[in-house]
Amino acid sequence: MPKANNAVAAKARRKRVLKKAKGYWGSRGNVLTVVKHAVDKAEQYAYRDRRAKKRTFRALWIMRINAAARLNGTTYSRLVDAMNKKSVEIDRKAMAEIAVKDPEAFTTLVKAIID
C-alpha cells in the first residue's frame, strides 16, 4: 500500500502563503520559511495601521478645521465649544471637507455657530 501524505493540502497551504507575499523582494517572496515571517510581520503592520489611520485622519481634520477657523477669527477649540453649546452636530470629517472645498460656506457656518 502506498504511503499516505498530505500533499494536496500542504501545497495549497504553501501556495496561499506565497500568494500573500507576491511582489516581495528576494527570498522574502519565494523561500517559504522567510515568506511566513514576512507575511506575519506585514499582517501585524496592517492590523496596527488600520487603527492608526483613524487617529491620523482625525488629527488631519482637526488641523484643517483649525486653520480655516483661524482665518475666520476664532480657534478650533472655541468653535467646537460653541458647536456643543448650540447642539450643532457636524462631524469633523464633513467640516474639514467644507473648509477645504468651500471656504465661503465654512465662513457662513462659523458665523452662524459663533454668533
Swiss-Prot record:
GO terms for cellular component: ribonucleoprotein complex; ribosome. Belongs to the bacterial ribosomal protein bL20 family. One of its GO terms (molecular function) is structural constituent of ribosome. It comes from Chlorobium phaeovibrioides (strain DSM 265 / 1930) (Prosthecochloris vibrioformis (strain DSM 265)). The lineage of its organism: Bacteria, Pseudomonadati, Chlorobiota, Chlorobiia, Chlorobiales. The keyword Flavoprotein does not apply. It comes from the Bacteria. Keywords: Ribonucleoprotein, Ribosomal protein, RNA-binding, rRNA-binding. GO terms for biological process: ribosomal large subunit assembly; translation. Binds directly to 23S ribosomal RNA and is necessary for the in vitro assembly process of the 50S ribosomal subunit. It is not involved in the protein synthesizing functions of that subunit. This is Large ribosomal subunit protein bL20.
